[in-house]
Amino acid sequence: MNQASNFNLREEIKEYWSMRAATFDEQPGHEIFSEAERSAWHTLFERHFGKGDGRKALDLASGTGVISHLMHDLGFNVTGMDWSEAMLEKARAKSRQRGSKITFLLGDAENTIEADNSYDVIVTRHLVWTLVDPAAAFAEWFRVLKPGGKLLVVDGDFVSPTWATKFNKAMAGFLETLGLRKPVEAIPQMQTHQDILARVHFSNGARADAVEAMLRQTGFDPIAVDFDLKRIHSAQKKHISFAKGLERGAQHRYAICAQKLLET
């Protein structure tokens, strides 16, 4: 993909997420819908980062500030960055309402323009699978992390069909044949999303081993891959349909913690 194509795709992605901002928090898996889920996220972050103790954290593609607030709960000095002003407006309003001292910046996760060695930790949720140039993004994140700092990537393969997606599709077709279910009409937003995802780097799905290998090539070491996200997903399932819950449980989801070595 050439530079011009990259630019056009990135603009499409920015426009898409700006369009989604108004309803983003209504969907389970975006906003937190229970204290059980909040606690599960806190546990994940503490497992890899420890307590905040005023350390500087950067939440990339921060959206409406969900992860930023979870990190703030743990005592981190949080900066959220997103390239959608519509998302940032939601995040700032939420921060004012909750009285949280979080800085929200308009910026690009692949080119943050932040100073070298400026953050103790970086966190991303469901960003990597949508990146146009993940190698460039990882190099940028490595640059802005302090020596000894940690990156936590929470992501998954949301593209490859699983047994659950195949089962749900077959059941939907069967029920439609019996006249017990109306055919689902295509949603324009969903088609736009699919068109975009067909052109990103991980268009066939962001598998943990591929992301880990790319992080290692960037210079991160050590790297730990964590598949123990059951508490988060169990809490989310209580707020979605049975079919969606099956799909979510069958997906390849993970958290990868990667460290920037201390300078010697």
Named regions from a protein language model:
Residues 135-147:
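A short glycine-rich, Lys/Arg-flanked "PGG" loop and its adjoining helix->strand segment in the class I
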Residues 56-60, 64-111:
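Class I SAM-dependent methyltransferase SAM/SAH-binding core
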